[in-house]
Regions:
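Short, surface-exposed "cap/lid" segments of acyl-processing enzymes
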Residues: 3-60
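Short phosphate-binding/catalytic loops that engage adenosine nucleotides
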Residues: 47, 88, 110
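Catalytic nucleophile-loop/oxyanion-hole region of alpha/beta-hydrolase
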Residues: 60-91
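Short, hinge-like loop/turn segments at secondary-structure boundaries
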Residues: 67-70, 110, 131
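Gly/Ala-rich beta-loop-alpha elbow adjacent to hydrolase catalytic centers
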Residues: 94-98, 102
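Active-site signature of alpha/beta-hydrolase-fold catalytic machinery across serine-
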Residues: 104-108
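Active-site nucleophile loop of the alpha/beta-hydrolase fold
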Residues: 116-127
Length: 131
């Protein structure tokens, strides 16, 4: 069962005036409200914008418990597809888990024109792997 969305945690969508779009992704235990200011700034600059409410977020903690990466990445990809219908150039940006999703989206969608990762939640790698 899904609880009602907390006021201010609603997804955000904007039809812009350019051929560029921005997909904005919030972090784990967060909701679209935490990234709304950034999304609205992109919209004010004329970009198409999608800021989805990731599965299990923005409602009640009980809704988050059964959700997994596949749910969140699926939500991100659906939002990307919606944005791609309006924008030929897409930049993906995200905070924390949204930053990790942004990295995943870049691998899944190499046609994306850019990424912005804000404190991405990633697994640290040993120095040998990085060399």
């Amino acid at each position: 069962m899904t609880a009602p969305t907390i006021p201010g945690a609603e997804p955000f969508s904007h039809i812009g005036s350019s051929d560029a779009g921005v997909l904005v992704l919030h972090g784990f235990t967060g909701n679209p409200g935490s990234m709304r200011g950034l999304a609205e700034a992109c919209a004010a600059a004329g970009f198409h914008v999608e800021l989805p409410q990731l599965a299990g977020h923005g409602t009640a903690m009980e809704d988050m418990i059964p959700t997994r990466w596949a749910d969140w990445s699926g939500d991100a990809d659906k939002a990307y597809q919606v944005l791609a219908k309006r924008a030929s150039k897409i930049v993906v940006m995200g905070l924390s888990m949204g930053g990790a999703l942004t990295l995943w989206m870049a691998a899944e969608h190499p046609e994306a024109k850019g990424i912005v990762c804000i404190n991405p939640a990633t697994q640290p790698q040993p120095v040998e792997v990085l060399n």
